[in-house]
Amino acid sequence: MKGKIRIRRAFAEFFVYGGLPKGVNAVNRLEAVNDAFREIYLAGVIVRHTVSNTSALRMLHKQVAESIGQPLSFTRLTKMVKEAGMPIAKNTCISYLQYACESSLVLPISNIVGKLQERDSSQKYYFVDNGFIRLLKSDPKADQLENLVALHLLRRHGFNDRVFFYRPKQLPSEEGRFPSTKY
């Protein structure tokens, strides 16, 4: 019985704070996750790509965390960052998101039924560690669960097109049927 309790407690901590080695044995796990986020990813992205608008980069990561589980287009993300008071161009937003993907901060998943252009420009993004979501969002439990499932699927099935989401062009009506099309 003690073994099950320890496993549940360890999973609960992993679920909330993630599994980065730096935070596992830390006294203040949230601070350790914050340090890892700041040092490894933000500093790596900022230094490697000479990002000058660091506040917009941080806001972009926050908006991605707020949108976990939702398809996120570059236009929508740019608008969300601008509405938060950070001036940013769409091309800059695209670059910042690509930097986050290159640094393995976030992982993209494409819509299987979208056009090729839509697959690249309207994806779902998941953070590589659940602790990062906890840093960027006030009530993250549902998003952390979806993030954890997405990470498991990506690890199990690979980072290619075998993991995707399905979002049809037309959503079903309240009765659960797709609208009929007349030819």
Regions found by a protein language model. Give the residues of each.
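Accessory nucleic acid-recognition modules appended to NTPase machines
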Residues: 24-182
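Amphipathic alpha-helical segments of the small helical/lid subdomains adjacent to P-loop NTPase cores
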Residues: 1-19
